[in-house]
From Swiss-Prot:
Record-linked NCBIfam families: lipA, PRK05481.1, PRK12928.1
Region (Disordered): 51-75
Span of domain Radical SAM core: 164-385
CDD domains (alphabetical): Radical_SAM (cd01335)
Catalytic activity: [[Fe-S] cluster scaffold protein carrying a second [4Fe-4S](2+) cluster] + N(6)-octanoyl-L-lysyl-[protein] + 2 oxidized [2Fe-2S]-[ferredoxin] + 2 S-adenosyl-L-methionine + 4 H(+) = [[Fe-S] cluster scaffold protein] + N(6)-[(R)-dihydrolipoyl]-L-lysyl-[protein] + 4 Fe(3+) + 2 hydrogen sulfide + 2 5'-deoxyadenosine + 2 L-methionine + 2 reduced [2Fe-2S]-[ferredoxin]
Stated name of the protein: Lipoyl synthase, mitochondrial
Keyword Transit peptide attached: yes
InterPro entries the UniProt entry points to: Aldolase_TIM, Elp3/MiaA/NifB-like_rSAM, LIAS_N, Lipoyl_synth, rSAM
Length: 414
């Protein structure tokens, strides 16, 4: 029985493909015939031992005059090809079904032993998003041409936030100023470009219309960083808040915005536009900031943004979020919490960093739920108004927003 057919192409005068069929598991020789070689006979043949690639090369070089350098290169390729065939599954493996279990890629075994290839811990697994409210929100977002950070950032909580039975308890985080950021933080999956498209002038109106349709009790507006705009998009975001308050006056509005390159006048515009919660994320501890965030975003600059918002409108709830699993230490997290309390930040959230793609920075550690509980207790002990802490918690997390909503409603009743 024959199972392999090998073709050899000789370069020279009057050349054609010369083929030989090789019997598996034997050292027998078979003739290689050609009708195109410049030999004394039209039916010239050379007997070549199949199992020895060196003898194959020597025999063929006599017919073609192949140079020593070319012979060496051909010999190496034939040897590599032969080795690859020998390492691969045999016909018997295919018949028995063992072939599917064999590792053909030599790098695959190495990948299987890396931390990234291991299965996620059970506490990081979530159900597939579904439900009437989920599909309703998803349809409206598409119809009105809006972007949501829930989708763009691949948030694991989208099913929980969008799919609640009570529509007034559902939460959506709408991303304004387009879906392309001018910065390139190493943890973020949002698209980046130095010159994104111009902001949609109808976006504030369309966003307000969507919020009115959904009847949400709480909405989060976030933006990509727009360093290409003079005001960083502050006026566009502020106008959106005002439109929402006009069309859905009972909806509480949180904005999660950037640092506006440290321009505190833009922070003033945002703080005074009528929003209820001013959020800006530190993302990580000070020592890791240069490695995690874009070089234009600094730890101290972010603290100054939160501090200025609180100073401008003291009744505002200020909020930030920190990712765990990036290699931070307990001492560094404690110092970060102290820095936040020194500027009177009200709310902090802790969540597990999860690598969006292989192009992003690796996860250093999957932090256990018990550790998240510990940081929640520490934050409350230090005087934070609220702390949402858990592996799947994100800055705009439904449970945290429900608490803030109740706090704000009580304030309004007074």
């Amino acid at each position: 029985m024959y199972r392999r057919s090998v073709g050899v192409l000789f370069v020279g005068r009057n050349t054609r493909w010369i083929s030989s069929t090789i019997r598996c598991g034997t050292s027998a020789t078979r003739p290689i015939r050609s009708n195109a070689l410049n030999t004394d006979s039209d039916n010239a043949s050379v007997r070549v031992p199949v199992g020895n690639s060196t003898e194959v090369e020597n025999a063929t070089s006599q017919l073609t005059g192949t140079s020593g350098k070319r012979r060496k290169g051909n010999r190496k390729r034939i040897t590599e090809f032969k080795d690859a065939l020998n390492l691969g599954p045999s016909f018997a493996d295919f018949v028995s079904g063992k072939a599917s279990k064999m590792i053909l890629d030599p790098l695959e075994k190495a990948r299987q032993n890396t931390e990234e290839a291991k299965k996620l811990p059970r506490w990081l697994k979530v159900p597939i998003p579904k439900g009437t409210n989920y599909h309703k929100l998803k349809g409206d977002v598409k119809e009105l041409g809006l972007s949501t950070v829930c989708e763009e950032a691949r948030c694991p909580n989208i099913g929980e936030c969008w799919g609640g039975k009570d529509k007034s308890k559902a939460t959506a985080t709408i991303m304004l100023l387009g879906d392309t950021c001018t910065r390139g933080c190493r943890f973020c999956s949002v698209k980046t470009n130095r010159t994104p498209s111009k902001p949609d002038p109808m976006e504030p109106e369309n966003t307000a219309e969507a919020i009115k349709r959904w009847g949400l009790g709480y909405v989060v507006l976030t933006t990509v960083d727009r360093d290409d705009l003079v005001d960083g998009g502050a006026n566009h975001l502020a106008e959106t808040v005002r439109k929402i308050k006009q069309k859905a006056p009972n909806t509480l509005v949180e904005t999660l915005s950037g640092d506006f390159r440290g321009d505190l006048k833009m922070v003033d515009i945002m703080a005074q536009c009528g929003l209820d919660v001013y959020a800006h994320n530190l993302e990580t501890v000070e020592s890791l900031t240069p490695h995690v965030r874009d070089r234009r975003a600094t730890y101290r600059q972010s603290l100054s943004v939160l501090e200025r918002a609180k100073a401008t409108v003291p009744s505002l709830i200020t909020k930030t979020s920190i990712m765990l699993g990036l290699g931070e230490t307990d001492e560094q997290i404690t110092q970060t919490l102290k820095d936040l309390r020194n500027i009177q930040c009200d709310v902090v959230t802790f969540g597990q960093y999860m690598r969006p793609t292989k192009r992003h920075m690796k996860v250093v550690e999957y932090v256990k739920p018990e550790k998240f509980d510990y940081w929640k207790e520490r934050a409350l002990e230090m005087g934070f108004l609220y702390c949402a802490s858990g592996p799947l918690v994100r800055s705009s997390y439904k449970a945290g927003e429900a608490f803030i909503e109740n706090v704000l409603k009580k304030r309004n009743m007074k």
